[in-house]
């Protein structure tokens, strides 16, 4: 293989089990450097509660600038009960929100794939989820999480009022819809756009702009519109009707979590947050497992690293266009599951329980 240019990767292990699962990603990166003539330069730093403990802030300016200079960021997990009582601006999760906003990561990709080896782990019947492969594309930097005005203010009679603003512009909708349509062209060529156009003006605009974009540039892709509450119901009733779902920040947050539980384990599911491409065709991006920091099992060597490793596979695919390497890594995960190896969260009768590091080593062994 031809040696490619040096690529800077910033690892932010974060809190709880984050350092343990990111360590397994680091092992994969070093293996690729040694065996596939890839040239990744790894930097590692603090974000989340661990950063607050050391620096008094969930992410320092220095770390943020490192993120700006990196090809992409690999995040472990942030947060935990230890920091629940901090003021809002100091909470570990603010590091994640700042990275998303300032790196302009507008599209969150959340695959919900049911591994055949684990189909019995789903709460739904096997025939409902077997073969499930959904990609949820969530708009990430607009909507009610970032809209202004916002806040809590006193009003008359000693009451208080909480305010959040839900708004979207044409450009915010169109750019994330383009991501969804482009992904669909590489999958089963179907997009379902979800909103609440029956009661929300922002939802009406969303539906109109997605339809107009489709009619202008993506007529070859099958497009349907669905109210978000109906989508939540359909994900339980008939999830395999979906290919790519595109939706706003709030509904995407909820629907992607719901879809993830169809698969049986959060420990298997990756995510990607993508930004716009510059004139050289490069884009900023951040990759992370969808599971939380799980402080109750931190340090016990029982965390599942598969979601983090598959997140790195997404980085190979979407940030570096290394599809063959991404395919090989995803196949290695499948092969290990076929061998019956399981971390504690996905362990079932007749399978062999392995530690976090042993699972990482087994996956690397399949890359040989």
From Swiss-Prot:
Q: What does this protein do?
A: Catalyzes the oxidation of 3-carboxy-2-hydroxy-4-methylpentanoate (3-isopropylmalate) to 3-carboxy-4-methyl-2-oxopentanoate. The product decarboxylates to 4-methyl-2 oxopentanoate.
Q: Which reactions are catalysed by this chain?
A: (2R,3S)-3-isopropylmalate + NAD(+) = 4-methyl-2-oxopentanoate + CO2 + NADH
Q: From its record, what is one biological process in GO terms? A: L-leucine biosynthetic process
InterPro entries in UniProt: IsoCit/isopropylmalate_DH_CS (IPR019818), IsoPropMal-DH-like_dom (IPR024084), Isopropylmalate_DH (IPR004429)
GO MF annotations in UniProt: 3-isopropylmalate dehydrogenase activity; magnesium ion binding; NAD binding
- Listed name of the protein: 3-isopropylmalate dehydrogenase
What pathway is it annotated to? Amino-acid biosynthesis; L-leucine biosynthesis; L-leucine from 3-methyl-2-oxobutanoate: step 3/4
Give me the Gene Ontology terms describing cellular component.
cytosol
Organism field: Pelagibacter ubique (strain HTCC1062)
Report which gene this protein is encoded by: leuB
The cofactor remark states: Binds 1 Mg(2+) or Mn(2+) ion per subunit.
Quaternary organization = Homodimer.
Keywords, sorted A to Z: Amino-acid biosynthesis, Branched-chain amino acid biosynthesis, Cytoplasm, Leucine biosynthesis, Magnesium, Manganese, Metal-binding, NAD, Oxidoreductase
